[in-house]
Amino acid sequence: LYALYRFWGGKMNEMDTRFANQYNIQWFPGHMTKTLRMMEQEIQHVDASLVLLDARIPLSSLNPEIERITARKPKLYALNKADLADPAVTEEWIKYFRAADAGCVAISAKQKGGANAVKAAIEKELAGLLERRQNRGMGGAKTQVMLCGIPNVGKSTFINTFAGSARAKAADRPGVTKGKQWV
């Protein structure tokens, strides 16, 4: 629309606007579509989802497609990079997510304590499931959690800290770690 506006020298009337609006270009990167389809298939095989958000901009780092895909599973939000965010504001965000009946914890993925806090929060969120497994004699069954989030929220760093070794390559730019990984 802006290009058409510039083309006509900044003079667009109502008819021009209607014409421009009927030719909206819908564009979504193919690799993102592929990943979302894979997530839709894999969500059936996990017990819960862990959505990693940037503590400095939680709503901006929340992808609505991830929300849609993970809607039917127990969910835990981890506000990563909490050491870089204002603690008072981070606490308000935690209250916000908990008010929506979702678990939420503030962490710094670079510190081992963050991974331990997430593990404890996941166990709390899945207490009912773990108890049912115990009653059925499946107490030793592994809990599978899907870690998801937009690029550069710290997923690879979290995986490496949680696993205790460099399982995922991490860098300060998006697209370094691609594909599905079981840790």
Regions found by a protein language model. Name each.
Residues V145-G164:
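Glycine-rich phosphate-binding P-loop
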Residues P29, L36, I57-S60, G128-N135, ...:
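Active-site phosphate-binding and catalytic loops of NTP-dependent enzymes
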Residues W8-A71:
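N-terminal accessory targeting/assembly segments
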Residues R56-P58, A82-A85, K110-G113, V176-T177:
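Conserved nucleotide-binding/hydrolysis micro-motifs of P-loop NTPases
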Residues H31-K34, A163-V183:
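Switch I (effector-binding) loop of TRAFAC-class P-loop GTPase G-domains
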Residues A85-M146:
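Canonical P-loop GTPase G-domain recognition
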Residues D47-L53, R72-K81, A102-A106:
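Conserved beta-strand/loop subsegment of P-loop NTPase cores
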